[in-house]
A protein has these predicted regions:
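Adenosine-phosphate binding glycine-rich loop
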Residues: 2-28, 223-224, 336-449
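Flexible, glycine/charged-enriched surface loops at secondary-structure junctions
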Residues: 23-26, 43-48, 122, 159-168, ...
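Structured beta-strand/loop patches that form or line metal/cofactor-binding pockets in enzymes
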Residues: 45-76
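Glycine/serine-rich phosphate-binding loop and adjoining beta1-alpha1 elements at the start
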Residues: 99, 118-233
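General beta-strand structural signal in soluble alpha/beta enzymes
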Residues: 163-167, 190-195, 239, 262-265, ...
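Glycine-rich phosphate/diphosphate-binding loop of Rossmann-like nucleotide-binding domains
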Residues: 204-312
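Rossmann-like adenosine-cofactor binding region
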Residues: 268-366, 371
Length: 449
């Protein structure tokens, strides 16, 4: 048996039967349920009400075809998905991912994680996620526009400002959000906050672009201060990825006194012992949409290496910001051997279960994704508030709220871990703290017969 509790084992067995072969989703459910062992001992009312049985089953899962015409006049067909996982504390909220790896399992895993992440923010937003196996890389702007319009034509039937609010994720940036919002507005003839991550000229929020990366560093800094009386100051930092999260995590880590020496993409990684020159990275990735290897051609003394060896670089703080399961047990061993003191996840579930176990066993401070990278969805919720009020807040106002939210997420997670006898285990603490609010809401709302 994977669980001490027969009840949790039964729940997990049923999830496995109903979702055969969905490895990402099953991995996420198992990790969360393991954290609930002390909760079901202490809260028999949760078991009696079948809260966890209901929690692991989405309220709604939508799959649809997305036909579109490429620049050669050929009809292409992709799959679209939206999982509306839980709305106990507010409308569904979660991003859209456009990537060839997107499938039912990935969307369900992301939507399930979103329940707890959104709850941890303290804001009234439920959990959802969506996307498509469409790959925007190598497509013209016209092709991306036609795809986005077709995708939104179907998705618009299922979302709304008070029902389900979407946002960006991997493969969905300002361009894609703009195309989809334009199509939604044409179809529904209304200007509402149904998508977040919008451009500033049509209802977007300042600091939304920076939010996930900044929030990751605010969380990590509070974790360092509270658990080890440390900070980013004079620490060597390695960050995987070179997209939005990695870029703004690099910026904030540097502002807080750290030295970021490495970034990566799917082909390899760069190492710059003098500290990453973020202006060069932004030019390559945001303006030219190039590959990270070009950094080594432009910055003397930096080195580009093909492959996935970024975690072999000696560092004090590691921030995986690329994709799920990028950091495995061997990588964890290497980081621990090289003296890492803190790891915090900027991507969704970037560390394998084996890696997480090794970090916790070695006493490495570990900030799980659902807590550490909640800054993006928190600021999305702040964008929803601004849209509802027909107001725009200053960058400083949004950033200050973001910082407070991330500090509170750390302390709520830490306090929950302490309350249930798992002090310092923020994986369990974040799961329990996020679950508590959702469970109470579900208890109050009863069961439909």
């Amino acid at each position: 048996m994977a669980f001490k509790s027969e009840y949790l084992q039964g729940v997990y067995d049923k999830v496995c039967q109903r979702n055969k072969g969905e490895e990402e989703f099953l991995q996420a459910v198992k990790e969360v349920l393991e954290s609930f062992e002390p909760v079901v001992e202490k809260r028999p009312d949760i078991v009696k009400a079948g809260i966890i049985d209901r929690l692991v089953e989405p309220e709604r899962f939508i799959q649809f075809r997305v036909p579109w015409v490429d620049d050669n006049g050929n009809v292409q067909v992709n799959r679209g998905f939206r999982v509306q996982f839980n709305s106990a504390i507010g409308p569904y909220k979660g991003g859209l991912r456009f990537h060839p790896t997107v499938c039912a399992s990935v969307i369900k895993f992301l939507g399930f994680e979103q329940i707890f992440k959104n709850s941890l923010t303290g804001l009234p937003i439920g959990g959802g996620k969506g996307g498509s196996d469409f790959d925007p890389k190598g497509k013209s702007d016209a092709e991306v526009m036609r795809f986005c319009q077709s995708f939104m034509t179907e998705l618009s039937k299922h979302i709304g400002a008070d029902t389900d609010v979407t946002a960006g994720d991997i493969g969905v940036g300002a361009r894609e959000i703009g195309f989809m919002y334009g199509q939604y507005k044409r179809l529904r003839n209304e200007f509402t906050g149904v998508l977040t991550g919008k451009g500033l000229s049509y209802g977007g929020s300042l600091a939304r672009t920076e939010a996930t990366g900044y929030g990751l560093c605010y969380f990590t800094d509070e974790m360092l201060k509270s658990m080890k009386n440390e900070s980013f100051k004079d620490k060597t930092v390695v960050i995987s990825g070179s997209g939005n999260v990695a870029i703004y995590a690099t910026q904030k880590a540097t502002e807080l006194g750290g030295k970021v020496v490495a970034l990566s993409d799917s082909n390899g990684y760069i190492y710059d012992e003098n500290g990453i020159n973020l202006d060069v990275v932004k030019q390559i990735k945001e303006v030219e949409r190039g590959r990270i290897k070009e950094y080594a051609d432009r910055v003397p003394g930096s080195v580009y290496t093909e492959g996935k060896g970024i975690w072999s670089i000696k560092c004090d703080i590691a921030l995986p910001c690329a994709t799920q399961n990028e950091l495995n047990g061997d990588d964890a061993d290497m980081l621990i051997k090289n003296g890492v003191i803190a790891v915090a996840e900027g991507a969704n579930m970037p560390s394998t279960p084996e890696a997480v176990e090794k970090f916790l066993a070695a006493g490495v401070m570990f900030g799980p994704a659902k807590a550490a990278n909640a800054g993006g969805v928190a600021t999305s919720a702040l964008e929803m508030s601004q849209n509802s009020e027909r107001l725009s807040w200053t960058f400083e106002e949004v950033d200050a709220q973001l910082k407070n939210i991330m500090i509170n997420i750390f302390h709520n997670s830490y306090n929950a871990s302490k309350e249930y006898g798992l002090e310092g285990n923020l994986v369990a603490g974040a799961n329990i703290a996020g679950f508590a609010k959702v469970a109470d809401a579900m208890m109050w709302q009863g069961v439909s017969y």
